[in-house]
């Protein structure tokens, strides 16, 4: 895919008509400004791999009309309609299971068997987070107010994550996925996502970057705690309008209610050592499950420089990775396995994404747009290879 400003097509050459091979496993995803050609491990079920080299660059107007045509086709299929029946059952069943978990916690009492309860509640916290995610994208109800109410209850009150903070961050991600310096999900932090981020590290931070592929899954055990802390810190940010400050105050009340209720319940039922172990297992597995659900979506996919101009359709498709699976995969990953369809139509209800997949995949094949789908384990392997390659400049035994 050529790094021309908006087309992402390869320059003409004697070999331009041949399908490009995937990049070597050790090569990290790079921005379009770092290299001329970005290759991906494309897997098109039922079609041949798209060959961007054989497609002439569309004009800006035609690119816009491509997404408009896809949007019309999806809308005519009825897949953007709300699914109140599905979400009534989904939300109700999730609340019952969450309540059952806490009831079991109270009934079991002082016992190391509570670590199994902690594992169950970690699963339910993540599933509750998926519902908060759906509400944040206005997938559940036609009313924005109802969606936000559901989102705040599920995120702030039930699992202790700041709904407002997450929505602001997640909207920036959806606007420019995998854009360096624009997508907060690839901002420099514990993990380096670009070699430029890795090169400036020193000391313990550099050691972390050198070994980040090996440490990735262990670090996810801290993701739940990191999300809690980030949400609480956002509550103390005084920036914003009067309305946003009022909203923050209400969120702060819900978060405080969750935190106080959680700690009181755990330390009231369990002795101190068991209570600490329960919290460690519960929050650790919650972070691991949440992180493993979101990690395959974009990590290791093509990345754009801040000022790269890419039309909406390609911006969302080329940076996203779908996970091949079945209905259990849909449940376990909260519909995030249809990441391409979700990014193209964020407000599409979760159960409709699997039906939209064939429409989107066929459309992409027809227009020569690379559509990336792989298995879950393969996606983790791709993510780890990318993280290992990004940390390459920090390993002195290699030459850069």
Task: Please annotate each region the language model reported.
Residues 35-64, 177, 199-215:
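Short, non-transmembrane cytosolic segments of multipass membrane proteins
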Residues 49-73, 219-229:
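Short, charged cytosolic
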Residues 73-85, 236-245:
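Short juxtamembrane and helix-loop transition motifs at transmembrane-helix boundaries
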Residues 82-128, 155-159, 212-227, 243-293:
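Alpha-helical bilayer-embedded segments of polytopic membrane proteins, i.e.
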Residues 120-241, 305-394:
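Membrane-embedded catalytic scaffold of the fatty acid hydroxylase/desaturase
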Residues 282-295, 299-300, 361-370:
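C-terminal, active-site-flanking charged/polar segments
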């Amino acid at each position: 895919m050529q790094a021309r400003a908006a087309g992402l097509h390869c320059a003409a050459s004697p070999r331009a008509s041949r399908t490009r091979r995937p990049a070597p496993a050790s090569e990290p995803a790079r921005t379009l400004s770092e290299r001329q050609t970005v290759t991906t491990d494309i897997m098109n079920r039922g079609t041949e791999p798209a060959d961007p080299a054989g497609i002439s660059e569309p004009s800006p107007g035609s690119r816009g009309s491509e997404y408009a045509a896809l949007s019309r086709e999806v809308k005519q299929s009825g897949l953007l309609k709300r699914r109140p029946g599905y979400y009534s059952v989904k939300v109700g069943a999730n609340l019952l299971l969450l309540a059952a978990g806490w009831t079991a916690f109270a009934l079991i009492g002082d016992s190391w068997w509570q670590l199994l309860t902690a594992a169950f509640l970690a699963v339910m916290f993540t599933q509750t987070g998926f519902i908060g995610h759906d509400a944040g994208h206005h997938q559940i109800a036609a009313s924005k107010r109802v969606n936000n109410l559901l989102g705040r209850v599920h995120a702030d009150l039930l699992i202790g994550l700041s709904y407002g903070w997450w929505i602001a961050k997640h909207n920036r991600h959806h606007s420019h996925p995998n854009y360096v310096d624009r997508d907060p999900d690839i901002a420099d932090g514990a993990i380096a996502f670009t070699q430029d981020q890795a090169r400036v590290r020193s000391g313990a931070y550099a050691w972390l970057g050198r070994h980040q592929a090996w440490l990735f899954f262990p670090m996810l055990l801290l993701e739940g705690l990191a999300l809690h802390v980030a949400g609480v810190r956002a509550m103390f940010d005084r920036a914003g309008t009067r309305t946003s400050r009022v909203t923050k105050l209400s969120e702060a009340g819900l978060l405080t209610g969750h935190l106080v209720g959680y700690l009181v319940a755990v330390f009231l039922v369990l002795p101190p050592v068991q209570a600490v172990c329960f919290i460690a297992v519960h929050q650790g597995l919650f972070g691991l499950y949440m992180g493993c659900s979101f990690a395959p979506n974009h990590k290791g996919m093509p990345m754009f420089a801040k000022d790269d101009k890419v039309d909406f359709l390609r911006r969302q498709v080329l940076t996203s990775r779908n996970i091949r699976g079945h209905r259990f995969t849909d449940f376990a990953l909260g519909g995030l396995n249809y990441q391409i369809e979700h990014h193209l139509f964020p407000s599409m209800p979760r159960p409709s994404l699997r039906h939209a997949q064939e429409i989107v995949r066929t459309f992409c094949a027809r227009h020569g747009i690379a559509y990336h789908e792989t298995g879950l384990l393969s996606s983790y392997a791709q993510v780890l290879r990318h993280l290992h390659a990004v940390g390459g400049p920090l390993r002195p035994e290699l030459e850069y």
